[in-house]
Amino acid sequence: MKDSYFDLNTFWKGIQGRFAANMGETAYENWIKPVRAVKVDLANRTVELQAPNDIVMQAWDNGNYTAKFMEYAYDVAHDFFKPELKVIKVVANPVNNQKSNQSNSDFVATDYQLNQNFTFDTWVIGDANELATSAAMAVSEQPGRQYNPLLIYGSSGLGKTHLMEAIGNRLKELQPDAIVRYITTDDFMNDWVNAISKKTTADFTSTYENVDLLLVDDIQMLQGKDRFQEEFFNIFNKITKSQKQIVMTSDVLPKDIPGLNARLVSRFMQGVAYDIQKPDFPTRLAILKNKSEEVGISIDNQTLTLIAEQIDTNVRELEGAFNTLTLMARAGRPINVSNAQKILEHLNITRQKVITLPDIQKTVADDYNVSINDLIGKKRNSDIVLPRQVAMYLIRTLTDTSLPKIGQAFGGRDHTTVMHGTEKIADLIETDYALKQRIENLSTKIKEKS
């Protein structure tokens, strides 16, 4: 594959996937997921990574993540790449700074650059995302008007972040002076903690309120965190009342996020919410054709059809297979049906299977030395209730199963019972280190079995 075919986003997703499979969930969420790959220097084989703060930077140094990055990079690209990690911050309240430079505050907020590859031009519209795309385009052209807030929800790997950042890129194209801020929910919470420690909460609030467009990824991470929910509620109200735009992504609808304050649920739903579903075959084929045009290589329709037929999970895996295919071209091997089939066979061996509810129930039951019948039955004694709630929590965090369906899997319990159980575990792991470690170990064990 020629260097011009290199897809940084797919490359980084492949590395993140290997980190996720080989470390604890909490460590991954704290130290790997918040990092963004923004630039590749193919001549020197380096990749520029953005970290949201110094704490993440220190974790990379202490955790030997650089060496792991290089190992996983070779797995993904069959070549050596070295990461260059930088902390990206922006001085608070950019509007005031441009005018008079009045603020001498030490407060800085996370400010990621928008991914320039995430545009409407590189987005493929299909039945699975048509409504969400229509709303996103409308918001990019007239922010703060009809759809405010706009919530885009759906399972991981379907393109929520791409569509959300496309809104930001389009608005900057139409209004170059517009202030657009993209953050993850974890970034927001980290910034708030830093502001409190530095006694700069007023600057924190000003920084987040003085925007034309606020893009917030993974809003479900607010679950069970009342203190952060209150602050986000206040900022949310200020932005929407000023007729500025908020766009959010989530795995599920707000009403299905356990531990989310009713006021926030109401506010989040005052605009519109559209889901992105798994792409159908025509959309998957169109995505592959779009990618081949993007990297400038010709792949016959039969080969693309084979890939589109066999990978029906999500866009991320589809692009991963395509990227592997183009890597073969870099090695001088032909891109054809035969080689595509070999790639798919390899992916079928290495790709994780779907985690099922029975898998989780059995793993938890074995770990706590209780029977499956007791775990899903009516017993309410403490030695049964805790593992039952742990199982519910793991199902909620490791799968896309809705609360009602989880309730059905536990003897037909009501969804509010499931919500209470998952909220209780989320609260407990904030203070009970032993339980937190046990759940992380269970999560790792479940993923390894799947």
Curated annotation (Swiss-Prot):
Annotated GO biological process: DNA replication initiation; regulation of DNA replication
* Residue segments, region Domain II: 79-112
The record's GO CC annotations read: cytoplasm; plasma membrane
Q: Name one Pfam family in it.
A: Bac_DnaA_C
Q: Where does ATP bind?
A: G157, G159, K160, T161
- Membrane-spanning intervals of the chain: none
- Start and end residues of each stretch annotated as Domain IV, binds dsDNA: 330-450
Residues covered by region (Domain III, AAA+ region): 113-329
Which locations, inside or outside the cell, does it occupy? Cytoplasm
* Region annotation Domain I, interacts with DnaA modulators: where it falls in the sequence: 1-79
Please provide the record's keywords in A-Z order: ATP-binding, Cytoplasm, DNA replication, DNA-binding, Lipid-binding, Nucleotide-binding
Which terms does the record give in the GO molecular function aspect?
ATP binding; ATP hydrolysis activity; DNA replication origin binding; lipid binding
Query: Does Hydrolase appear among the keywords?
Result: no
Record's PANTHER family? CHROMOSOMAL REPLICATION INITIATOR PROTEIN DNAA (PTHR30050:SF2)
Main role?
A: Plays an essential role in the initiation and regulation of chromosomal replication. ATP-DnaA binds to the origin of replication (oriC) to initiate formation of the DNA replication initiation complex once per cell cycle. Binds the DnaA box (a 9 base pair repeat at the origin) and separates the double-stranded (ds)DNA. Forms a right-handed helical filament on oriC DNA; dsDNA binds to the exterior of the filament while single-stranded (ss)DNA is stabiized in the filament's interior.
Report quaternary structure and partners: Oligomerizes as a right-handed, spiral filament on DNA at oriC.
Q: What is known of its domains?
A: Domain I is involved in oligomerization and binding regulators, domain II is flexibile and of varying length in different bacteria, domain III forms the AAA+ region, while domain IV binds dsDNA.
| HAMAP family documented for this protein | DnaA_bact (MF_00377)
Q: Record's family?
A: Belongs to the DnaA family.
Please give the name of this protein: Chromosomal replication initiator protein DnaA
Q: Lineage in the entry?
A: Bacteria, Bacillati, Bacillota, Bacilli, Lactobacillales
